[in-house]
Amino acid sequence: MPENATVTGSLVLQRVTKCYGIAKDQQVAAADEVSLTVEAGEYAALTGASGSGKSTLLHLIGAIERPDSGTVTANGVEVTALRGGPLAAYRRTVGFVFQRYHLLPALTALDNVIAPVLPYRTNWSKRDRGRELLTAVGLAGREQSLPSRMSGGEQQRVAIARALVNSPSLLLADEPTGNLDSRNAAEILELLAKLRGRSGMTIILATHDAQIAARCDRLVRLRDGAVVDDIDLSGGYPAEEVIRRVGQLG
């Protein structure tokens, strides 16, 4: 299997379906025949009500879960067909940021960042990479801080640095500002935009917040696991129309 299953080219979902059992002999489709193409370098927002399938779609794209049917293809390689080493290699090209930071409380900010680093890197190069990323996310000088000594916004910055430690070509962010106040949320969004500008990576962000969605290049609205809107925002799409559409979450 090719080793270039990365999102340096288009990310293509074709009729992707994922169902979960909610009771005996009863299933619900969290992703329902989703077909979607995300171009390399795009900043796309997935919106929809709670339970609309945003998180499930991110998990399927990141190969955390497998679809029941349909395919996910990255850079021309079918991710859903990968196993073993090639699958692990693909997962390393994907960074995840979640609403909850999931930092290890006994580790410093630096050690949290470098925890996922590939084992073949030397300890020195790992720590250099960690310091570089902490500086990039605005936490220079906080390398030895424990999570308990950091604000929510600072902890989310550490989580973003950790997600970037293996230089992913795709960043999947699941409600990354959900636990933050408005000031910290705005700073995190600005940080993501800057990091994307520097690296050219693709970002897919799940959010129910219209103001956040309006910052993206692309709006994909989900309802009951299906795509109901797919709008290009890069050409100056009116923010008020984004807000109206995201407001139609039901």
Please place each PLM-identified region on the residue numbering:
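Conserved beta-strand-loop-alpha-helix hinge in the C-terminal portion
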Residues: 226-250
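ABC family nucleotide-binding domain
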Residues: 9-11, 15-215, 222
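Pre-NBD coupling/linker segments of ABC/ABC-like ATPases
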Residues: 1-5
